[in-house]
Amino acid sequence: MFGGAHELSIDSKGRLAVPAKFRDILSRLYTPAVVVTLESKHKLLMYPVAEWEKVAAQLLNLKVADNPVLRRFQNLLLHNAEILEWDSAGRVLVPAGLRKRVDFDREVVLVGRANRLELWGREQWEAEMVQALDDDPDELAFQLGQTDLQL
């Protein structure tokens, strides 16, 4: 499983050096490739191919005929998905089309989140962390109480 956050830079050619920690997990548990897709204007998602196949199957099973919001979300993820393999230096080429759609450029944070990686712009990541730390702990406790999560 992936974890941790790494501040990185996308070079002028659009390449991102994937930390060895993440490459090792991919090589050991999956294949040395990821599927990258657009989730929002703030973030790209990167899945091991096997995990992406599960997500894609779930997306294809969504009942979207009468729900334009879900249909657009389904299309966003599926239409923008591309397989990336790293080069001999451990870098992946982030597709230009995806780089064009997100509101970050070179300074990024690659975050491990269980079965996937998330690529955030550094400013967006920092804002998300500030918001999470500023959330009302009583409200969080209430919301968590409505779930089955046990920490």
UniProtKB/Swiss-Prot annotation:
Native source species: Neisseria meningitidis serogroup A / serotype 4A (strain DSM 15465 / Z2491)
Domain of life of the source: Bacteria
InterPro entries in the record: MraZ, MraZ_C, MraZ_dom, MraZ_N, MraZ_sf, SpoVT-AbrB_dom, SpoVT-AbrB_sf
PROSITE patterns linked: SPOVT_ABRB
Assembly and binders: Forms oligomers.
Subcellular locations according to the entry: Cytoplasm, Nucleoid
Xref: SUPFAM superfamilies: AbrB/MazE/MraZ-like
NCBIfam families on file: division/cell wall cluster transcriptional repressor MraZ
Protein family per UniProt: Belongs to the MraZ family.
Domain SpoVT-AbrB positions: 5-51, 81-124
Chain segments annotated as transmembrane: none
GO CC annotations, alphabetized: cytoplasm; nucleoid
Any GO BP: negative regulation of DNA-templated transcription initiation
Keywords tagged on the record: Cytoplasm, DNA-binding, Repeat, Transcription, Transcription regulation
GO molecular function: DNA-binding transcription factor activity; transcription cis-regulatory region binding
Protein name: Transcriptional regulator MraZ
